[in-house]
């Protein structure tokens, strides 16, 4: 981390068995996609200082996290995959933001937010007024400031694959092309899960066949960003971390405001509404 005859009959059957076995494994792998929710990274931010044990700030933080366990308390947020809650006034204001991966909306989103929230509050960054944690399916941020709508250029990290690309098997241009196409879809496709509001989903996933291989990708921006903000965020992080991923078979780049991933294997179910085969 930086801060893809009877003898002849037997010979005919062998490749058939191999193909069928491979297909069964692929079906099983695809059907199990998005079932994991691994911890990825966290950051305790020192700028906003720490709160005192037993303080009003801590109580507000506890109350908000506990409310996430009640599905009726924030059902809209879990259904849409995003929420920003702010309580009190500065310097005692408590702001909690969560963003779930679009294909993890609903119960998966709630489960991830509850797990990540308690992990951040109790284990990773106790007493910090500002902290952020990333899981496979969501991110959760605590803060004493309201930064909604702003691109965060400070809290980010790059997780490249351990495997390098061989030669020019998948060129830099091909990977950039996929990420750019996904970003265009993300900022133009309307979110079908928000009733009465025509808002871009700011998420897209898909795959591109390149010779004998396929390249899989995903992009997402935080729901509080504008279309312009999403475009700017994606461009910034693609360029900012290019040295981290340009020679790698896969990568995850995550920030508070946007993230992207590409791999030489499928990592998101192709059955979703926002999945495209180019």
From Swiss-Prot:
What are the record keywords, sorted?
A: Repeat, Secreted, Signal
Provide the family line. Answer: Belongs to the cysteine-rich repeat secretory protein family.
Where is the Gnk2-homologous domain positioned along the sequence?
39-147, 160-267
Q: Which Pfam families match?
A: Stress-antifung (PF01657)
Domain of life of the source: Eukaryota
One GO CC term, this protein: extracellular region
Q: Sorted alphabetically, which CDD domains does this protein's record hold?
A: Gnk2-like
Task: List, alphabetically, the Gene3D superfamilies matched.
Answer: Gnk2 domain, C-X8-C-X2-C motif
Protein's name according to its UniProt entry: Putative cysteine-rich repeat secretory protein 19
Any signal peptide, and if so, which residues? 1-32
Q: Which InterPro entries match?
A: CRR_secretory_protein (IPR050581), GNK2 (IPR002902), GNK2_sf (IPR038408)
Source organism per UniProt? Arabidopsis thaliana
State the compartments where it is located. Answer: Secreted
